[in-house]
Amino acid sequence: MNNIRIYAFFWMIVLLTVSCYEDKGNYDYHPINEVKISGIKEDPYEILRWDTLKIPVTLENSLNEKAKLIYAWYLDQKKIAETEDLCYVVSDKAKKYQARMEVTLPEDDSVRFFADFEVQVFSPYSKGLLLLSDYEDYPEVSFMSTLNNPTNKIMRDVYSLENKRELKGRPLAIEQSDGWSYGGTVFVHTSASSHQLDPVLFKEIALFDENSFTGPAQEYDMVYCRFEDAITEFGGAIGKDGIIYPKQARQNRYMASSLKPIHVEGDAERLVDYRLSPMLLNTRNSTLGYDNLSGRFMYFMNSYDIPSYDENQYDEVRISQTYIGLPCLGWGKNMSGGTYQFSSLFYDPVTDRAALARAHSAFGKLAGKDSLVFLSGHHLAEGSVMAVNSGINWLYYSDGGRQLYVLNLSDPDFKFPSIPFECALPDNCRITMLKVSVDNLALFVGVETDRPEKYKGDVYKINAKDGTILEHYQRFGGTPVDMVEKKSVEYDVEE
């Protein structure tokens, strides 16, 4: 019995030995040529649509520097190239893509080496400067990209280019909404209509015209229009008839127009007429205007007690106690005390009198007895324009020609009401637009030149504190009216 066990154990050892020997012969160990990919950035590549994306790479082989390799480049899993270096005309939609460069060994396609990265595709209109100008009595929109545009190439008349029709009326304003109220869309306002444009393609997605009123269609002739104010998603327009047409975000029509004449707060039996300067400061269900008939601020609101066509209709007004008596030239936001306050400039070209409301609330109440200052040494004139820099509390204004002046709104004594703000603008120009940059560090100055050519409008970007010219954009458009620093909006767009 023991012999049988020993015999069985012997043959088991023999079989195992033979098996190990044969198994060893089945494995064929060959070193693999490993490929290291370098030259691809960690940060996303930013590229304008229709531009060429070029990415040169360096490949290091562990065994054979002359090894034949197979290359592939992918954009969201779509193969876009089969070359070692990428040279690709980006025709893809504007959005962020996950990309990959992949290297395969021809003798074994299961062995792959790759490098992942991101590509952010912007439309030609993703980010830059949008200028609304008056070109031979017609509105025109020009755009200059600030992405990969070293020569400051300007695209003119982009509304007509993308929508195959022209704007009509007089140019009033251009603005870009925030992401919450309108999704970053662009608005172009003229006296004849307002146009809501897709922020990626500049295609018109909504039109506000004579059919956009609450009630029956009527003549559309505006002297002022903005749909988004500094502190709210409410906006509005002022018609040539002097009536206010409120506008709320995400509504495709104007709300009911303001009563004219209108009831006075606290005395519903009393009605007053008004003639507003072309500007509004909108808050929720209310707006501040300036009445040139009474020479005072008027705060328009809904009383909820007076029967009206629309629950948001302005049917009551609060008249400011402060008498100013001069037409309002403009206003802007300042940050006195860290809260929202506003500064307004008044000027009457007939009498050459000027005044400054250094700080007032959104309701028209002046902040202190010294807030209203009548300017004796001013340089305002017919055609003057103004802007407020909320970062440093300066008010800039022009003299109707090429000279700039500044008012220091934070000066407690206000000893120097008009300080020349030196800037080396050419002699043959007239300032028609002032716009403070989003970061408050620069001032965009739009000028009309006397050049005998088609596009006479230039824009200068100057240092907000010392007037040094930072950039000069020649032939930006017609006579500059308004400008917006367009920000990019990242989302996919159906085309």
Residue ranges and their predicted role:
Residues M1-F9:
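Bacterial N-terminal signal peptides that target proteins for export
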Residues L16-S19:
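C-terminal motif of bacterial Sec signal peptides marking the signal peptidase cleavage site
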Residues Y21-E162, V436-N440, E448-E495:
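Acidic/polar, low-complexity intrinsically disordered N-terminal segments immediately downstream
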Residues S133-K168, W180-N211:
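Beta-propeller domains
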Residues Y135-P139, S193-H195, I243-I244, S294, ...:
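Short glycine/acidic-enriched loop and turn motifs that connect beta-strands
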Residues K168-S177, G184, V223-Y224, L276-S277, ...:
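Signature of short aromatic-glycine-proline-rich micro-motifs recurring in repeat-based ectodomains
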Residues S181-M386, S390, W394, V406-L407, ...:
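Preference for solvent-exposed, low-hydrophobicity sequence contexts
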Residues L372-S384, K415-V438, D466-D482:
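Conserved blade-ending motifs and adjacent loop-strand segments that build the rim/top face
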